[in-house]
Amino acid sequence: MRRIYAAWTLVAAAGVMDCSPRLEKAAAFTLGPDSQVIVFPFMFQGYNIVVLPTTKYGDLKGNARRRVASFLEHNISHAVWYFVVGGIAYKDDRSERLFSEMMDGYLKKISAGASKVYKGGRKMFSESLETVHEMIFECNKAGDGHVVKYGKSIINRLSDMIENAPTGISAEEKREYRRFWSRVKERAGFLYSTERLRRVVEVEKIVCNACKEICLKLKEEELMGLLAEGKMKKDLKATVDEDEIGHCLYLEYTVVNTSLLLDAHREHGGDVTRELVKQMLLGKKGDEIDRRYINKVANVVKERQRREMEKKEEEKKKEEEKKKEEEKRKEEKKKKKEEKKEEKKKKKEEKKEEKKEEKKEEKKEEKKEEKKEEKKEEKSGKSLREGEASEEAEMPSVEVGGARRKTGKKSEGGRKRYKIHRRVSRWRKSPEKIKEEWDKGSEEKWRGRSLEEIKEQKVFHDIMGVLELLRSEDADKFFIDTGDYTKGGSERQRMVAIGVLESGGKRMAGVVEVGTFKDSSSGCPVVYHLMFRVTGIEGMGDVMSPEFAEANDIEKIDKNREYQDEGMFVYPRGVRFETVKETDAFQIVWGNPSNTSKVLRRLTIQRRPYVI
């Protein structure tokens, strides 16, 4: 360990991560009276997140599970210790011996206990980190915890060093020696004070809880956006070798004024604290968080809550209106049904009455006929009687059986400009045509792919609607510039946006990648790479890194008349998509040409998190 005079050493080292309490590298900080290192409940390996605040042991798989279990069992307590307390380096090993005697076994025991509880599967990682802090810095009511005792031993050693200054040095050197170690003793008194240790535990608990709530409340793609934007994993990485840290598990931190953070939590509540922690995760430095900034965040949160309340009231009002309309429709439907029923009943009654009338008429007709018959019979009888007197009398004609005559009637009844490379625009064509062109092309990556593979890849590459967002003035609100690099003799730029692709009943979170180079003649950026890459939270670090872009990019770009102006791009007939721009998202929706209400695919690009 190197010699440090100006500050207490706060360390997260490669040695700690590699299952050893021995420190090989150190990061030093000068802390103010109220400043404190806060450990975030996220565990990293290289660029990637291995453990989230909400991760339980059962969520971990394979090698990640073994490595995390080993880290917890052997190193978690030592890592927390060197973040929060650190150590004093001197020319001999007296400090190391005291630490080994009093703290090493104590910390190992806490790590083993925390690991056992975490493996039980009930606790989240954030809760385990809280427990480790509580156990290490535990102070009883009398303020006589293990760390306090260790601190007293350190102070006694420092007092002894001050009293027994080295011999053989001048009076001036002796005064300087005692002055320096007196300052160190004063600092040690602060570091190991009961008040500070209790505050350490309280603040860490608040931060861990805030991180947990952030992860629980955000959608996967929103959390991906937060982590992609954040710089919390960069502070430690800047002080430790890239290759070394790429193979180690490590925690990250920030230095913040704990008194201000506690005051903010007590005055403004959990919502403001959560937003402050979120801003830290987005890269806000602790020394930038003062009372003025806290008030600014509180106002932002208050305004957001007001808008949310208005939105809820509006939605509630709409819901009530919708409910009233629905009830009105039901009443009208019921009324129409009853009216229809009544009308049907009325018609039935009318029909019944008509039948009665018809029967009456029939009876009247029958009676008339009967009377006619009677008259005829009377007349006929008279004629017969007259015929008896005269045989030459004529016989009258009669209707046989009383039949009626038939009537003969039947019953009645300003923007940014981009050029598009052919390797991007060809994805708008049919799979057969795409395959034909790739097979004739020079890129080994695509030559010889099956038609099925081309069809699958078309879903991820045929996203030309992204260009509408890219050339708009709001592009920077959605896309993160991951930096420039050179490959195959050309300078290239890569931009990434977090998004969700819905296709074939699947919902896939990932990133929209845009690769560009500058046209040498016009200086206009040319889009030569455009795709949606499926990735989860655990792979975000790699996907966002410049190394990933360079490794996965094509070796050489054919620049010989291979691109056209973006405005000339046209989709073939029958293809339909529309773009929908909202405050926090940009959507591209592909509909069925024969039935526009049916959505075939939807790509939603998330807005970057708001930095206050």
UniProtKB/Swiss-Prot annotation:
Q: Where is this region: Disordered?
A: 304-424
Q: Which domain of life is it from?
A: Eukaryota
Q: Which Pfam families match?
A: DUF1609, DUF3654
Return the Basic residues bias intervals.
Answer: 331-349
Cited InterPro entries: DUF3654, UPF0329
Q: Which family does it belong to?
A: Belongs to the UPF0329 family.
The protein's name is UPF0329 protein ECU05_1680/ECU11_0050
